[in-house]
Regions:
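HotDog/MaoC-like acyl-thioester-processing domains
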Residues: 8, 37-38, 42, 106-110, ...
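Hydrophobic beta-strand-centered segment that forms part of the acyl-chain substrate-binding groove
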Residues: 4-10, 77-113, 139-141, 147
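Conserved positions in beta-strands of structured domains
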Residues: 30-33, 98, 103, 115-119
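Beta-strand-rich interaction surfaces with strong enrichment in secreted/lumenal proteins
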Residues: 17, 60, 102-104
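Flexible, low-complexity linker/boundary loops enriched in proline and small hydrophobic residues
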Residues: 2-33, 145
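Compact, glycine-rich, soluble single-domain proteins
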Residues: 48-51, 55-81, 94
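Catalytic strand-loop segment that frames the active site of acyl-thioester-processing enzymes
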Residues: 23-64
Length: 149
C-alpha cells in the first residue's frame, strides 16, 4: 500500500474523490463498503431516475447503459489500484475491456454492487476481473486492464 492511511469503511464520496479524479456527473460510485488492499473492492452505485443519462436511455423504459456499468466498475478498480499501488495513483488509464457480458437490465431503484478483484499485476499495469450485481443477481461481468502510474 502507498504511504496514505487506510480509509475507514465505508468510504464516503469525499474519501473516494481523494482516490480518483472523477467528479459529478461522471463519478459513478457512491461509496465503498469493502476494500482489501492488493486483493479486491466492493463499491455501491444507487441508480436513480434523476440520473441524467436515463432521460434519453430510453424514454418511457429507462435502462442504465451497460457502458456506464463498466465505467462504474472501472472507477471502483481505480480506487483499489490507487490504494494498492506503492506510490499511490496519479493517473489511471483503462487499457483493455474484454469478455464483457450483460446478464440483466439495471433500472432506476436498483442498487449496483460493483466488485473488482486484482487478477494480476505488473506495475504499472493491473488486470482486474469484475462484476456488477443487483439483488444478488449478476447484471454484468467484465475483465479490465489499466495503466496506473
Amino acid at each position: 500500500m502507498n504511504g496514505e492511511a487506510m480509509p475507514e469503511m465505508p468510504m464516503d464520496i469525499l474519501a473516494i474523490q481523494k482516490c480518483i479524479p472523477h467528479r459529478y456527473p461522471f463519478l459513478l460510485i457512491d461509496r465503498v463498503i469493502e476494500l482489501n488492499v492488493n486483493v479486491n473492492i466492493v463499491a455501491i452505485k444507487q441508480v436513480s431516475i434523476s440520473d441524467g443519462v436515463l432521460a434519453g436511455h430510453f424514454p418511457g423504459n429507462p435502462v442504465f447503459p451497460g457502458v456506464l456499468i463498466v465505467e462504474g466498475i472501472a472507477q471502483a478498480a481505480a480506487v483499489l489500484g490507487h490504494l494498492s499501488h506503492p506510490d499511490g495513483l496519479r493517473q489511471c488509464y483503462l487499457t483493455e475491456i474484454s469478455e464483457a457480458r450483460f446478464r440483466r437490465p439495471v433500472v432506476p431503484g436498483d442498487t449496483m454492487v460493483l466488485n473488482a478483484r486484482i487478477a494480476k499485476r505488473r506495475p504499472p499495469f493491473f488486470w482486474f476481473e469484475a462484476d456488477c450485481s443487483v439483488n444478488g443477481e449478476i447484471a454484468a461481468e467484465v475483465k479490465l486492464s489499466a495503466y496506473i502510474k
